[in-house]
Amino acid sequence: MTLIVTGAAGFIGANIVKALNERGETRIIAVDNLTRADKFRNLVDCEIDDYLDKTEFVERFARGDFGKVRAVFHEGACSDTMETDGRYMMDNNFRYSRAVLDTCLMQGTQFLYASSAAIYGGSTRFVEERDVEAPLNVYGYSKFLFDQVIRRVLPSAKSQIAGFRYFNVYGPRETHKGRMASVAFHNFNQFRAEGKVKLFGEYNGYAPGEQTRDFVSVEDVTKVNLFFFDHPEKSGIFNLGTGRAQPFNDIASTVVNTLRALDNQPPLTLAQQVEQGLIEYVPFPDALRGKYQCFTQADQTKLRAAGYDAPFLTVQEGVDRYVRWLSGQV
């Protein structure tokens, strides 16, 4: 049967297409908006059955033009947290998602979709409960509002609905994201260009570079999506992070040591990297004060209860792999 991936030329969507290909799945309809044409590169090594613009797709899907569709991986969205056009964000992320959901429910199609940890805003608890959800920007609000729709329809849904609140995802095929690409991507490029990585200094009681995030490899994000694809009886909204908060220092230090290893140089401790000027701390910008999360960490209770028991890559493991992949692309 046919599979559909929206946002297929994007970061996570393209990784899902590639992972499906590795299982022998090629009857895939890739849906995206290639106004920014450089994203096509993410699909060059992938096999798909057809490509459709996102506007054409939603109309044809509702008409039943694709016959029996087993599953939709809905990864397409505007993920720019700095976007201020609320009308565009709500049309693109909320209204469009509702249209795809409605058709999946009518046709009995599995619906696996991208939510976001941005829903939690400034919360210090990251559990899938309404009382800790307080988005700080319109991107987070668009995701939050759609999750509320899901909560209302889940009790009566006859087919799978699985939403994943992605934390800080990094990995291959994110180059097109520019400023919204991961910290690992920017650290890699900065070190290659300047010979050092710059991190924020002390802020809000956190030592330089010790502000933390739940950094999750796109490899693990893809594996979780495919686990639920294989288990259509499992529905709900799930955090998708490692369950470990790791400091930005870990990202930067791993980037530096992996690039050193590729240059046949020995690893250095964080202290040695700082002493040698390979990591530099800059004053925390005034513009971000009061708007910056110093800590995120996914509560994995629901995900583990659903039966996903595979370990997640640490920053040291995942970023090392990613830097080696990036080095092979330049």
UniProtKB/Swiss-Prot annotation:
Keywords: Carbohydrate metabolism, Isomerase, NADP. Its cofactor is NADP(+). It catalyses: ADP-D-glycero-beta-D-manno-heptose = ADP-L-glycero-beta-D-manno-heptose. Pfam families: Epimerase. Pathway: Nucleotide-sugar biosynthesis; ADP-L-glycero-beta-D-manno-heptose biosynthesis; ADP-L-glycero-beta-D-manno-heptose from D-glycero-beta-D-manno-heptose 7-phosphate: step 4/4. NCBIfam families: heptose_epim (TIGR02197). One of its GO terms (molecular function) is NADP binding. The keyword Isomerase applies. NADP(+) binds at residues 11-12, 32-33, 39, 54, 75-79, 92, 143, 169, 177. This is ADP-L-glycero-D-manno-heptose-6-epimerase. It comes from the Bacteria. Homopentamer. It comes from Burkholderia cenocepacia (strain ATCC BAA-245 / DSM 16553 / LMG 16656 / NCTC 13227 / J2315 / CF5610). PANTHER family: ADP-L-GLYCERO-D-MANNO-HEPTOSE-6-EPIMERASE, NUCLEOSIDE-DIPHOSPHATE-SUGAR EPIMERASE. Substrate binds at residues 168, 179, 186, 200-203, 213, 292. Belongs to the NAD(P)-dependent epimerase/dehydratase family. HldD subfamily. Binds 1 NADP(+) per subunit. The active site is at residues 139, 177. HAMAP family: Heptose_epimerase. The lineage of its organism: Bacteria, Pseudomonadati, Pseudomonadota, Betaproteobacteria, Burkholderiales.
